[in-house]
C-alpha cells in the first residue's frame, strides 16, 4: 500500500520546490517590512515632542525675561513664589538673570513675597545689588522691600562688586552702614576685599567705621592687604592717618 502523504509532509515537500522557496521568501520579506514599519512607527512616536510642564515653562520664561509668558502663567494661577529645582524662588531668579520686566510682573502680583530667599539666604534685592541692576533695586524698594536684613545685606553685595550708584541709593534708604555678616564682615570690608577704592571712600564718607573688626580680628585695611589691593591699602592707610591726626588735634592739651 502506498503511503498517503500527510499534511505536514506535503508542506515540507512544497517548501523545497522553486515555487515554495519563492513563496517563503515573499512571506519573510512581508514580515520584515511589517517589522521595519513597526520600528519606524515606534521611532516616530518616540520622537514626538513632550509638552513641557507649566512650572518648567514658567522658569524658562523668567530666565529669558519673557514677560508675556509669565503674565499668562500667573493669570492661570501659577504661584509667584514657586521655586526652581534648586530651590530658587522666581523673584530671586529674575534678579539673578537681570530679567527686569519679569521682575515687574512678579512684584505687581499681590501674592508675591518680595522678601523671599533662596537656600543660601539671598533675596532678590541682594542679587540685584550684586549685579548692579539699579532698576531692579529701585523696583523692589518701591514695592516696600527692606534694604536691611540680618546677616548679609544688599549693601554688602553692592559694595563687593563696587556698584557705587547702588551703594548710594541703599544708604539714601537708610541701609545700615556697618551691617555685620554672620562673622562680622562689613560692607567696607567687602569693598576693600574687591579693591573698590571709590566704594570704600563712599562708605567712609557716609560714616563707616574703618577700625571695626570681624570675628577673626580683621578690619578693612587687613582685607585690602590680604587680597593684595595696593590702591585700596594706600587709600585706607591715608584715611586712618588723617583720622589719627584729627583725633590728636582735638585732644585737650596736657597741663
Predicted segments with their positions:
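Ankyrin-repeat-protein effector appendages
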Residues: 2-27, 47-60, 143, 173, ...
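Conserved ankyrin/ankyrin-like repeat signature
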Residues: 69, 101-102, 135-136, 165-166, ...
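Ankyrin repeat domain, specifically the short helix-to-loop turn at the C-terminus of the second helix
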Residues: 71-79, 104-113, 138-145, 168-176, ...
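Ankyrin repeat boundary signal
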Residues: 82-83, 114-117, 146-150, 177-180, ...
Amino acid at each position: 500500500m502506498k503511503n498517503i502523504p500527510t499534511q505536514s509532509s506535503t508542506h515540507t515537500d512544497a517548501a523545497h520546490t522553486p515555487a515554495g522557496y519563492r513563496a517563503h521568501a515573499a512571506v519573510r520579506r512581508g514580515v520584515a517590512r511589517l517589522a521595519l514599519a513597526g520600528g519606524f512607527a515606534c521611532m516616530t512616536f518616540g520622537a514626538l515632542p513632550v509638552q513641557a510642564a507649566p512650572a518648567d515653562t514658567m522658569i524658562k520664561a523668567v530666565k529669558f525675561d519673557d514677560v508675556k509668558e509669565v503674565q499668562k502663567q500667573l493669570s492661570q494661577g501659577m504661584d509667584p513664589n514657586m521655586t526652581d529645582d534648586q530651590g530658587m524662588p522666581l523673584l530671586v531668579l529674575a534678579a539673578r538673570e537681570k530679567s527686569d520686566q519679569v521682575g515687574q510682573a512678579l512684584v505687581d502680583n499681590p501674592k508675591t513675597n518680595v522678601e523671599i530667599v533662596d537656600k543660601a539666604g539671598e533675596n532678590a534685592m541682594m542679587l540685584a545689588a550684586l549685579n548692579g541692576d539699579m532698576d531692579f533695586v529701585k523696583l523692589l524698594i518701591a514695592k516696600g522691600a527692606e534694604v536691611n536684613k540680618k546677616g548679609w545685606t544688599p549693601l554688602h553685595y553692592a559694595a563687593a562688586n563696587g556698584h557705587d550708584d547702588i551703594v548710594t541709593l541703599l544708604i539714601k534708604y537708610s541701609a545700615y552702614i556697618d551691617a555685620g555678616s554672620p562673622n562680622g564682615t562689613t560692607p567696607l570690608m567687602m569693598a576693600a576685599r574687591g579693591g573698590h577704592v571709590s566704594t570704600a571712600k563712599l562708605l567712609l564718607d557716609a560714616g563707616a567705621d574703618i577700625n571695626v573688626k570681624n570675628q577673626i580680628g580683621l578690619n578693612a585695611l587687613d582685607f585690602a592687604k590680604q587680597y593684595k589691593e595696593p590702591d585700596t591699602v594706600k587709600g585706607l592707610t591715608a584715611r586712618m592717618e588723617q583720622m589719627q591726626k584729627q583725633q590728636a588735634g582735638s585732644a585737650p592739651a596736657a597741663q
